């Protein structure tokens, strides 16, 4: 675990970013004339791998590459995204806690990281609803 964290920090110029706007278009190339490949929602975490002017080349949890304008991102907080469909979000940190009313959620559901307690992460969605999720079930950047 320590090694993975070290590699992320010391590896090339990869940088953790979060979508800060309600919606964001991820494109095939750097510019609005390039095809829109995916529209993501607030708090989607991405990893910056390159830059061309005001455009960032980014990688998602699946390793797919896109381009997005720098004004769509923030580094002020960490974000997380669900890695698989039908993932339970809970009222507290542990399986003894009940799932929240809006659980389960599917892959690509994005959230802001609030805090970590052992192997559980408290998250908040774009509507301001909070829940807990088991750390191995999310990709955090």
Enumerate the predicted regions with their spans:
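Conserved beta-strand/loop element in small beta-rich adapter and peptidoglycan-binding domains
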Residues: 35-52, 96-117
